[in-house]
Amino acid sequence: IFGEWKTSNNFIFGIXALVIIMVGVIXTXYTEKGDGFTQKTTNKDILFLVLTTXGYLAYXAXPKTITADAESMFLPQTLGILLGSVIYLAFSGNKAAFKEKASYLDLFAGISFGIAAYAYIIXAQVNGVTNAFIYGQLSVIISTIGGMTLLGERKQGKELVATLAGLCLIVVGAIL
């Protein structure tokens, strides 16, 4: 799409790497059935998924579609993310979130995301959108291991094997 893969070998290895990474990410989210948690997917959920996917595609492709430096793109993208969040809250019916203390404490996570987003924009300009996406997916490794060690998320048996296999696949895909 962005002309980053010049040869057929680049294309084959690139597609394979993306597929391997996606399979790895899916494997890290594996949970065994019977944990007592079920959730019905509604049309509203699917609509939000489609809209957020379209927003993410626009966000991820913006560094290659315009000829501006990372600093000048950062504020418009940040405002777009903020607007998207406000629209999501307005349509989800959770207007009380604007008054909750927890929402404002989440600003720290937002600042962390902002730093990561800025790094992504720079990486996309320097390395290309595809490579920046792949490098960004390596954060799944950090968050998964951090969740298991720092936050005490428990994974045993098949879940642990699937998670570790998924992390290995992400690394293999990133190396490709």
Swiss-Prot record:
The keyword RNA-binding does not apply. Pfam families: Sugar_transport. GO terms for cellular component: plasma membrane. Keywords: Cell membrane, Membrane, Sugar transport, Transmembrane, Transmembrane helix, Transport. The keyword Glycosyltransferase does not apply. One of its GO terms (molecular function) is carbohydrate transmembrane transporter activity. It is found in: Cell membrane. It is a multi-pass membrane protein. The chain crosses the membrane at residues 10-29, 46-63, 73-92, 104-123, 133-152. Its main location: membrane. Belongs to the GRP transporter (TC 2.A.7.5) family. This is Putative sugar uptake protein. It comes from Lactobacillus delbrueckii subsp. lactis.
